[in-house]
Every structure is written in structure tokens, then in C-alpha cells.
């Protein structure tokens, strides 16, 4: 189980595919998403990584959090989220996750806070059909009708669909396809709509109902201290120079 990422919802647009189709996508932007701390089995009883994103002013950060950011050698963050991971997918503290953490064609689950609609009636909130437009109905055309029972049980059950506050709740949309990523600009483009308003923080994770495709970087795609993405295998490490080899032979 890999770590997710914290992204900012930029808005919606469309992308044109090579076969001429245009696909509606939501643009999500990574804003300096770094690992702030780790949770391990030995110390905490479970494994997880805490990610931070955005750039907060130091004067607006509590002293305890300032110390946490200083120990991790990262700048103060606006948003902190913890992601459960498997022990072999723990990321080092301080690394920055890049957009190619996900690949095109992969499915992800996206969580965000839905846009608030205020107080809404049952026709808008629960898709009720309303009462009849004529024949004895007076000033109750959009009401929900009876809410209770008879003398037994003599109460309204909890969870009864009625008018009330709509939106501004935590929503997860599952199995959205990643259409394209741009590691240089930190953009992830997913097909379809994503819960939340523009400028809001959104969480993106690997889809729990779909297997990971081949080519997904494990434990993830990241860079250290501004370097290029460190997802390359160890076999691609540069060979030693002849001067270094000669120095080793003469030692």
C-alpha cells in the first residue's frame, strides 16, 4: 500500500486524445508536497507517513509545529495529512513527492469536502418527487409529506430523509482515471469531476477496488532537496570514472 498525495484543485478543462476524442478532466496541482514525519510499528504500532503541503508563514504556525518542521528540515506547511502505508513503502522524511507518483491509465480514489449548498429541501437534497400539483394539495407541493409512524413506534427514526443542510461533507469519488501527468509543473489530470471547490485541498490515493498497473513507481516518485525525481533503479547509477578506479588500485 503506497502513500497518497495532497493536491490543490485548480479547475476543469478538457484534453484532446490522439484519436480525436476530447476528455473532460480535473486539474490537480502538487504544491511542495513533502514527508514531514513517519509512523513505525516499533514506536507507534502502525506504519504511516505524514505529508505536508503548501507554504505557511512562520508567525501563523504553532511553536510545537515549528519544532516538528525544523526536525524534518522542511518549511512550515499549510496542510498536514497522514497516509497509512505498508512497511516497505515508507518514504524518508524530507523527500518531495512528484506528479509522476501516478501514471496515465491508473485509477485513483479522490477525497475532498463537497461544495456547501446551505439549507435545502428534500426535492433538491434527496431527489424526492414532491406532492401532487393539484387535487387537494395546498402550499405543500415540495414538502416531504408524513415523517412519522403510528402510535407504535411513535417516533421518527434517525436518518429519515428530510430537509436540512446540504453539502460541505467529506466525499470520496472512486475509480477516476488518470489521463495525464506533468512532473515539471506538478500537475495531475484525472477524468471527470472531483469533489470540492476550486482552490481546495484534495487527497488522491491508489484505487482500493482496482489493481495497480505495471510501471507504477514503488514506493513512489520523489525528489530530494530539489534534485530530479529519484525513482530510477539502482542499476542505472553512474559508473566510476577512470581516475577514481586508478586511485583505488593504487591504494
Swiss-Prot record:
Q: Which GO terms describe its cellular component?
A: cytosolic large ribosomal subunit
Q: Which keywords belong to this entry?
A: Methylation, Ribonucleoprotein, Ribosomal protein, RNA-binding, rRNA-binding
Instruction: Report whether Ribonucleoprotein shows up as a keyword of the record.
Output: yes
Post-translational changes noted in the entry:
Methylated by PrmB.
**SUPFAM superfamilies the UniProt entry points to:** Translation proteins
Residue ranges, compositional bias (Acidic residues): 242-251
Q: Which InterPro entries match?
A: Ribosomal_uL3 (IPR000597), Ribosomal_uL3_bac/org-type (IPR019927), Ribosomal_uL3_CS (IPR019926), Transl_B-barrel_sf (IPR009000)
Please list the residue ranges that the record marks as compositionally biased, kind Low complexity: 228-241
Which Gene3D superfamilies does this chain map to? 3.30.160.810, Translation factors
For region Disordered, the annotated ranges are 219-251
What PROSITE patterns does its record include?
RIBOSOMAL_L3
Asked if the keyword ATP-binding belongs to this entry, the reply reads no
Single Gene Ontology MF annotation: structural constituent of ribosome
Q: Name one GO biological process term.
A: translation
Any idea which residues bear N5-methylglutamine here? 151
Assembly, in brief, is: Part of the 50S ribosomal subunit. Forms a cluster with proteins L14 and L19.
What is this protein's function?
Answer: One of the primary rRNA binding proteins, it binds directly near the 3'-end of the 23S rRNA, where it nucleates assembly of the 50S subunit.
Report the sequence similarity comment from the record.
Answer: Belongs to the universal ribosomal protein uL3 family.
- Protein name (Swiss-Prot/TrEMBL): Large ribosomal subunit protein uL3
Species lineage, top-down? Bacteria, Pseudomonadati, Pseudomonadota, Alphaproteobacteria, Hyphomicrobiales
Amino acid at each position: 500500500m503506497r502513500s497518497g498525495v495532497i493536491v490543490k484543485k485548480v479547475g476543469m478543462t478538457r484534453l484532446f486524445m490522439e484519436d480525436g476524442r476530447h476528455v473532460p478532466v480535473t486539474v490537480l496541482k502538487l504544491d511542495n508536497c513533502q514527508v514531514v514525519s513517519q509512523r513505525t510499528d516499533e514506536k507507534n504500532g502502525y506504519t504511516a507517513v505524514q505529508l505536508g503541503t503548501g507554504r505557511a508563514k512562520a508567525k501563523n504556525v504553532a511553536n510545537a509545529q515549528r519544532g516538528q518542521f525544523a526536525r524534518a528540515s522542511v518549511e512550515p506547511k499549510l496542510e498536514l495529512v497522514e497516509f497509512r502505508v505498508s512497511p516497505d513503502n515508507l518514504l524518508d522524511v524530507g523527500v518531495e513527492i512528484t506528479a509522476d507518483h501516478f501514471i496515465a491509465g491508473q485509477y485513483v480514489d479522490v477525497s475532498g469536502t463537497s461544495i456547501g449548498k446551505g439549507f435545502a429541501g428534500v426535492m433538491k437534497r434527496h431527489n424526492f418527487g414532491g406532492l401532487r400539483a393539484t387535487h387537494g394539495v395546498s402550499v405543500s407541493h415540495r414538502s416531504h409529506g408524513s415523517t412519522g409512524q403510528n402510535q407504535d413506534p411513535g417516533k421518527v427514526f434517525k436518518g429519515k430523509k428530510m430537509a436540512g443542510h446540504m453539502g460541505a461533507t467529506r466525499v470520496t469519488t472512486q475509480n477516476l482515471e488518470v489521463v495525464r501527468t506533468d512532473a515539471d509543473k506538478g500537475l495531475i489530470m484525472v477524468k471527470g469531476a472531483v469533489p470540492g471547490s476550486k482552490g481546495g485541498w484534495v487527497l488522491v490515493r491508489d484505487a482500493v477496488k482496482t489493481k495497480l498497473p505495471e510501471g507504477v513507481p514503488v514506493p513512489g516518485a520523489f525528489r530530494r532537496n530539489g534534485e530530479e525525481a529519484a525513482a530510477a533503479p539502482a542499476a542505472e547509477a553512474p559508473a566510476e570514472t577512470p581516475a577514481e578506479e586508478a586511485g583505488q588500485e593504487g591504494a
